[in-house]
């Protein structure tokens, strides 16, 4: 077969030079790795060739099937499938979240390194300048534990439960290492609150509010950091992936960041994969036209900021708690 290394995946190895578009020979030498251990780079939209005859089902009489490289890193495909325009930040929201923006060139400065932002490659050698953060893992672990305690929280009831809950002036650093592993999540939350001298929630509804507001405020911190690093303001935040169905988190995020939040496609990764093929075959002339088609053909919701003054005060307290 044709063994190649697709660019968006290669860029996540920390061994790929995103400026020279090849593996970093100096880094490889420092690891005593010959460049020859890595196959030739293939770019999204390029062809691996055609399926061999033995791969077809018996009796197949159709045309030979061409195998194209897509953005094989799922977030790269998801970002391509994001129907955003102008200066926007994206949040690929799943078990974990990735928040960033698109750049034409990598940003390889000390400030980016200290902030732990990475330059990963997207379609057309664009740069996905982003940082990983907590996603739906934390809230799902809390829900799972309440279910084990005989207090299940159906997804359909989450908004109702949060609306019914009392406000809580406590906050979590959702990226604290204590929240990274599964199991006993309620106890981990309680221990964190004890350690930071904060009030614990009184019931499952308040736990939901606590986690969601902490995630939203964490996104604000990331967006503010991103804006400083790239030296421009983000007009909006576009959330793609399964996590964008969390309407409470979407609204809390709009409140926290004081700008519009827009939901993009839930299946952005699949759409991005398809767009590579459409562009390759001339259905769309470029990324701009492809994204316009996504915008026209998928449904989205917009969330406008509410209670901004209240959320600004929450953010001040949040920053004091997490000490960042």
Language model feature labels by segment:
Residues 2-3, 15-25, 29-32, 53-236, ...:
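Active-site core segments that coordinate phosphate-bearing ligands/cofactors
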Residues 28-46:
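A conserved helix-loop-beta module that forms one wall/lid of the active-site cleft
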Residues 1-17, 40-43, 48-53:
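Short beta-strand-loop/turn "lid" adjacent to the catalytic site in phosphate-handling enzymes
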Residues 43, 241, 265:
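Small/polar loops that bind or transfer phosphate-bearing groups
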Residues 8-10, 35, 124:
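Short glycine-enriched loop/turn motifs at secondary-structure junctions
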């Amino acid at each position: 077969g044709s063994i190649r290394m697709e660019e968006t995946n290669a860029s996540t190895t920390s061994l790929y030079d995103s400026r020279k578009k090849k593996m970093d020979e100096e880094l490889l030498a420092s690891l005593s790795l010959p460049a020859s251990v890595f196959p030739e780079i293939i770019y999204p939209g390029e062809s691996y060739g055609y399926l061999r005859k033995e791969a077809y089902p018996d009796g197949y009489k159709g045309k030979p099937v061409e195998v194209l490289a897509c953005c094989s890193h799922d977030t790269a495909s998801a970002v391509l499938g994001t129907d955003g325009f102008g200066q926007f930040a994206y949040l690929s929201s799943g078990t974990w979240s990735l928040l960033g923006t698109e750049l034409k060139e990598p940003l390889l400065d000390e400030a980016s390194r200290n902030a732990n932002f990475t330059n990963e490659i997207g379609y057309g050698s664009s740069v996905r300048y982003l940082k990983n953060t907590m996603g739906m893992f934390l809230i799902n672990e809390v829900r799972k534990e309440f279910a084990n305690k005989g207090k299940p929280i159906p997804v359909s009831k989450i908004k109702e439960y949060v609306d019914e809950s009392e406000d809580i002036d406590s906050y979590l650093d959702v990226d604290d290492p204590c929240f990274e592993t599964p199991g006993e999540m309620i106890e981990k939350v309680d221990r964190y609150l004890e350690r930071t001298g904060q009030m614990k929630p009184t019931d499952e509804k308040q736990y939901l509010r606590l986690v969601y507001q902490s995630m939203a405020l964490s996104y604000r911190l990331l967006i503010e950091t991103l804006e400083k690093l790239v030296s421009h303001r983000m007009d909006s935040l576009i959330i793609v992936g399964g996590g964008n169905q969390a309407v409470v988190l979407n609204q809390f995020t709009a409140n926290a960041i004081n700008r519009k939040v827009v939901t993009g496609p839930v299946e952005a990764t699949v759409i991005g994969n398809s767009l590579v093929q459409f562009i390759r075959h001339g259905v769309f002339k470029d990324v701009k036209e492809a994204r316009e088609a996504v915008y026209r053909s998928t449904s989205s919701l917009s969330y406008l900021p509410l209670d901004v003054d209240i959320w600004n005060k929450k953010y001040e307290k949040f920053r004091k708690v997490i000490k960042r």
